[in-house]
Amino acid sequence: MNQNLIRLGYACLNSDLRNYDIFTSRKPILKTVKSQGFDYVKETIIRNLRDLFTIIIYNESHGIRFFRISSSIFPHLGNPLLPDSDYDLSFAKNLIKEIGSYAKINGHRLTMHPGQFVQLGSNNEEVVRRSFVELQNHATLLEMLGYSSLDSSVLIVHGGGTFGDKETTLERWKSNFRKLPENIRQLICLENDENSYGILDLLPVCEELNVPFCLDIFHNRVSKNRIPLTKKLMKRIINTWKRRNMTPKMHFSNQEPGLRRGAHSKTINELPEYLFRIPDMFQTSLDIILEVKDKEKSVLKMYFKYFDIETNIDGRNNFILKKDYSLKKN
């Protein structure tokens, strides 16, 4: 089987380009918005989008084709403290379309991860309403980029709080999920966390609702609900993606020494070799986000450690898993 089936990616910020003031999370404070007007917010979004384009071009030139877009790219969208917060992204549609076209033509996978305020299991109706708005905003950006679940694009969300009763909260989560518009439901992907919802809490929900499950290996490792990643369990996880004809997505990091449990490491020096066996074992491709502070530096470090670089006739770089790793068995 072709071993060019594992891709590595990173989230939100390019640490190299950040040194040149290229980043996508500019957010003017409310006082500035009120004094300079809402056009200033739109100018900020344009700057964020242009820098997103630069990051994707950087990724392409370095053979990185998996990236999570920052949720901070559209500041104050839906912020109830601002009178004009109901703006939409249509003012930037041409730039967004250009970015998406470039990314799709070059085979990039783009995803997003709405923040902790998305709580579909909340017992507060206003929190749920705002969660719907937040999810719609994220879905709209992906759609304007030309991406959908058919491109394996997803909106990663956590189970959220337990509100004193995990079982009841999960039932509320499922009920509210079913109320979401179809376009959003198609993008939702559940991820385990290290505190409230482990793999066995969320995987059955995913299987019931036909939602892909994003395995966060690090969260499981440091969780009080930690479980062994057996072949049987991995098959269940992979199947939540395969039945949707989507490429499985996982997250990996390490614990940063001296910080709170669950704090992502600054860098990564090695990957678990069992990950390299997944494509052959389950006949699937696999994309892995490295959730680390040095971002693309760890991605490239791991690519050069475990993969061979291949340059096509058109000058595009691709990373092929080294035979030393691709041939290893269980």
Curated annotation (Swiss-Prot):
Q: Which InterPro entries match?
A: UvdE, Xyl_isomerase-like_sf
- Gene Ontology molecular-function annotations: endonuclease activity
Its BP terms in the Gene Ontology are: nucleotide-excision repair; response to UV
What is a single cellular component term in the Gene Ontology annotation?
virion component
Q: Where in the cell is it found?
A: Virion
Predominant cellular place of this UniProt entry's protein: virion
Q: Which UniProt keywords apply?
A: DNA damage, DNA excision, DNA repair, Endonuclease, Hydrolase, Nuclease, Virion
| Known EC number | 3.-.-.-
Enzyme class, spelled out: hydrolase
Query: Is Nucleotide-binding one of the keywords UniProt gives this record?
Result: no
One short Pfam name that applies is UvdE
Query: Cross-referenced Gene3D superfamilies, in alphabetical order?
Result: Divalent-metal-dependent TIM barrel enzymes
- Explain the purpose of this protein: Endonuclease for the repair of UV-irradiated DNA.
**Family, similarity comment:** Belongs to the uve1/UvsE family.
What is the protein named? Putative UV-damage endonuclease
**Taxonomic source organism:** Acanthamoeba polyphaga mimivirus
